[in-house]
Amino acid sequence: MKVIATLYGLLFLTVVLGDITEGNENDLVENFREELSEADIPLLKKLEAIEDALLEKDFLPYEEEDRNARPKRCAKVRNWCAKNEDCCCPMKCIGAWYNQQSSCQSTFMGMFKKC
């Protein structure tokens, strides 16, 4: 029973202190607005416009990059290749989907190829 009473007491204090904190924040905002001069208002509007522009820029949809345009690298030999074939025998060099990396994929026909 004491545990339940203690929990109710903590819940009550949390609610009361939360309201007090919110009230203090509102008072601080009102005091800040009173301290602003007429000269500060255009500056604040400029700052808000800059902030809105930055937020809008951050959330613009990005164009998906063409993964075929990325350079391909032979992971086993560690050299860059322009073509998929003859990159790392008996492997085939394929481009990765991210970070411009690539990996070597084993091919059966590549085993009989001369490098």
Swiss-Prot record:
Positions of transmembrane segments: none
Record localization: Secreted
Keyword Methyltransferase: no
PROSITE patterns recorded: DELTA_ACTX
GO CC, alphabetical: extracellular region
Coiled-coil residues: none
Molecular function GO labels: sodium channel inhibitor activity; toxin activity
Top-rank taxon, per record: Eukaryota
Keywords: Cleavage on pair of basic residues, Disulfide bond, Ion channel impairing toxin, Knottin, Neurotoxin, Secreted, Signal, Toxin, Voltage-gated sodium channel impairing toxin
Tissue distribution: Expressed by the venom gland.
Primary location group: secreted
Removed propeptide positions: 19-73
Span of the signal peptide: 1-18
Secreted recorded as keyword: yes
Disulfide bonding pattern of the chain: C74-C88, C81-C93, C87-C104, C89-C115
InterPro entries documented for this protein: Delta-hexatoxin
Family indicated by similarity: Belongs to the neurotoxin 06 (delta-actx) family.
Entry comment, domain topic: The presence of a 'disulfide through disulfide knot' structurally defines this protein as a knottin.
Function: Neurotoxin that slows inactivation of voltage-gated sodium channels (Nav). In vivo, is lethal to both vertebrates and insects.
Listed name of the protein: Delta-hexatoxin-Hi1a
Source organism of the structure: Hadronyche infensa (Fraser island funnel-web spider)
Lineage: Eukaryota, Metazoa, Ecdysozoa, Arthropoda, Chelicerata
